[in-house]
Amino acid sequence: MARVTVEDCIDKVDNRFDLVLLAAHRARMISSGSQLTIDRDNDKNPVVSLREIAEETISPEDLREELVHSLQKFVEVDEPEPDTVPLIGSAGASVDADDTEVAPERMTEEELLKGLEGLAPPEEQPEEDE
């Protein structure tokens, strides 16, 4: 029975490996209580799922979509974009428009040397032998 059913299904699903995935997923759905679309006739769930695909009472595309959805661990939710926020540069330009241009202060060599003299020299640490 199953061999004939698989041969009937190849017309509906081109790839036999995809057919196995879809039929197995449908058989698991039937085991978990999903409604049958054909009579059982004392067949087991995998055979019933193949017969459903062969008789086109269930769409292979719908099965594929349900299979992908069941395997997803993360479902992406499209959230609306936040309202446009003004750029910092454009907001800052309006605030700084009245200010005069700020020039960096120049330090002479003598001022630099006087500043360095006031600093304490770094403490020497003894070298450790490994």
Curated annotation (Swiss-Prot):
Q: What class of enzyme is it?
A: transferase
Residue ranges for the region (Disordered) are 80-130
Kindly state one GO CC term assigned in the UniProt record: DNA-directed RNA polymerase complex
A Pfam family (short name) is: RNA_pol_Rpb6
Q: Which residues form a coiled coil?
A: none
What reaction does this enzyme carry out catalytically? RNA(n) + a ribonucleoside 5'-triphosphate = RNA(n+1) + diphosphate
GO biological process terms, alphabetically, are: DNA-templated transcription
Q: Which UniProt keyword terms apply here?
A: DNA-directed RNA polymerase, Nucleotidyltransferase, Transcription, Transferase
Q: For this protein, what is the EC number?
A: 2.7.7.6
Alphabetized SMART domains for the sequence? RNA_pol_Rpb6 (SM01409)
The terms under GO molecular function for this entry are: DNA binding; DNA-directed RNA polymerase activity
For bias type Basic and acidic residues, the affected ranges are 103-114
Source species, domain of life: Bacteria
InterPro entries xrefs: DNA-dir_RNA_pol_omega, Pol_omega/Rpo6/RPB6, RPB6/omega-like_sf
HAMAP family given for it? RNApol_bact_RpoZ (MF_00366)
Q: What does this protein do, in the record's words?
A: Promotes RNA polymerase assembly. Latches the N- and C-terminal regions of the beta' subunit thereby facilitating its interaction with the beta and alpha subunits.
Quaternary state and partners of this protein? The RNAP catalytic core consists of 2 alpha, 1 beta, 1 beta' and 1 omega subunit. When a sigma factor is associated with the core the holoenzyme is formed, which can initiate transcription.
Give the similarity note: Belongs to the RNA polymerase subunit omega family.
Annotated protein name in UniProt: DNA-directed RNA polymerase subunit omega
Upper classification of the source organism reads: Bacteria, Pseudomonadati, Pseudomonadota, Alphaproteobacteria, Hyphomicrobiales
What gene name does this entry carry?
A: rpoZ
